[in-house]
Curated annotation (Swiss-Prot):
Gene3D superfamilies per record: Spore Coat Polysaccharide Biosynthesis Protein SpsA, Chain A (3.90.550.10)
Entry-linked PANTHER family: 2-C-METHYL-D-ERYTHRITOL 4-PHOSPHATE CYTIDYLYLTRANSFERASE, CHLOROPLASTIC (PTHR32125:SF4)
Secretion signal span: none
InterPro entries, A to Z: IspD, IspD/TarI, IspD/TarI_cytidylyltransf_bact, ISPD_synthase_CS, Nucleotide-diphossugar_trans
GO biological process: isopentenyl diphosphate biosynthetic process, methylerythritol 4-phosphate pathway
UniProt keyword Nucleotidyltransferase present: yes
Record-listed E.C. numbers: 2.7.7.60
Residues under site feature: Transition state stabilizer: 16, 23
Marked site: Positions MEP for the nucleophilic attack: 160, 214
Metabolic or biological pathway: Isoprenoid biosynthesis; isopentenyl diphosphate biosynthesis via DXP pathway; isopentenyl diphosphate from 1-deoxy-D-xylulose 5-phosphate: step 2/6
HAMAP family from the UniProt entry: IspD
Protein name in UniProt: 2-C-methyl-D-erythritol 4-phosphate cytidylyltransferase
Molecular function in Gene Ontology: 2-C-methyl-D-erythritol 4-phosphate cytidylyltransferase activity
Length: 232
């Protein structure tokens, strides 16, 4: 029987938020932002363990109370210089301390994506549990896309047919994901699915919800808080 594990890479600085504090610790609906993702993941009976990968020397984590998640949560201080490196380091460290098999599923989720709900999480696992490759939550692109020149003038309109906006969690088997990220080398990977694609595999796109947004800019905080309040 395959088990499910979750991993949150939380070693980033969140520079686009214009705040000195890493954005995963910014207050959202009275809690650190990362708390909301942890609550959904740790409350899922299908997930055996949830790992958070921090930067070495992270001082913010210890300032908050995570005891409500203690039965399922593990903290790893092995974050790297890039997201891919952080995920890879976390995967290796997680297996050292936990009985993770090569065919077990790992769900990698953004720390700054706080509005993931339990139903959407279950949908992802249901649709991918028997899949040969794995996949990710995503939404079809609805807006018109423009290609700009260096001066921010629109050069042309890009066709949006077949284009999807990737979200997280992204769910792949442990060994496949480790192999994909290990082979990425110096290539910049903005998500785990990109590393899987580089192996010649085709991750499945599971239709998601636009409310599963990533907090990237300061104005996103108000929208995320509104979504969280309406979901309760």
């Amino acid at each position: 029987m395959q088990n499910f594990f979750a991993l949150i890479p939380a070693a980033g600085s969140g520079s686009r938020m214009g705040d000195r504090m890493p954005k995963q610790y910014l207050t959202l609906a009275g809690k650190p932002m990362i708390h909301h993702a942890l609550a959904t993941l740790c409350n899922s009976p299908r997930l055996s363990r949830v790992f958070v990968v921090l930067s070495p020397g992270d001082v913010e984590w210890a300032r908050h109370d995570w005891s409500e998640f203690s039965s399922k949560l593990s903290m790893l201080e092995c974050g790297g210089a890039t997201r891919a490196e952080t995920v890879l380091n976390g995967l290796k460290a997680a297996q050292e301390g936990t009985a993770i098999e090569d065919d077990d599923w790992v769900l990698v989720h953004d720390a700054a994506r706080p509005c993931l709900g339990g139903k959407l999480l279950d949908k992802l696992m249901d649709e991918l549990e028997e899949d040969e490759v794995g996949g990710l939550l995503a939404v079809p692109v609805a807006d018109t896309l423009k290609r700009s020149d260096p001066t921010c003038r629109a050069e042309r309109t890009e066709p949006r047919e077949g284009l999807w906006q990737a979200q997280t969690p992204q769910m792949f088997r442990y060994r496949t994901l480790v192999n994909a990220l290990s082979g990425a080398g110096g290539v910049t990977m903005t998500d785990d699915a990109g590393a899987i694609e580089a192996l010649g595999l085709r991750p499945k796109l599971v239709v998601s919800d636009a409310r599963n947004l990533k907090v990237t800019y300061p104005q996103d905080l108000a929208l995320a808080e509104l979504i969280l309040k309406n979901c309760k």
